[in-house]
Amino acid sequence: MSMQDTLADMFTRIRNAQMAKKVQVEIPASKAKEAVAKVLKDEGYIAGYEVTGDKKPVMTVELKYYEGSPVIEKIARVSRPGLRVYKSAGEIPKVKDGLGVMIVSTNQGIISDRAARKANIGGELICEVS
């Protein structure tokens, strides 16, 4: 059986690895997952990521901890295959009053909520991270 929501699988793998105190986690790679990982790295939620392999690329995500506890408290899918959620730039919600980040898929790529508001572009709300 094929996987329907690969981004939700990525978030679940990250969540499970952090609960198990893993240093890194391997995820089947795709361009969308790579773009999400770039936003997570830019926002300081992960230490880094690397894509290896040609036929079946694998992305290794290095997780980040602060004083022994995971930096990512919550990572949850917002828009899903059964219920897509689109918002304009002004309607994009703030996560934890600006302390968290909403990852948005726009026509200019996958970016953070702050970058989307600054560029005044809306899009599909992929996930919220705090």
Swiss-Prot record:
One of the primary rRNA binding proteins, it binds directly to 16S rRNA central domain where it helps coordinate assembly of the platform of the 30S subunit. Part of the 30S ribosomal subunit. Contacts proteins S5 and S12. GO terms for cellular component: ribonucleoprotein complex; ribosome. The keyword tRNA processing does not apply. Belongs to the universal ribosomal protein uS8 family. The keyword RNA-binding applies. GO terms for molecular function: rRNA binding; structural constituent of ribosome. SUPFAM superfamilies: Ribosomal protein S8. GO terms for biological process: translation. Keywords: Ribonucleoprotein, Ribosomal protein, RNA-binding, rRNA-binding. This is Small ribosomal subunit protein uS8. It comes from Alcanivorax borkumensis (strain ATCC 700651 / DSM 11573 / NCIMB 13689 / SK2). InterPro entries: Ribosomal_uS8, Ribosomal_uS8_CS, Ribosomal_uS8_sf.
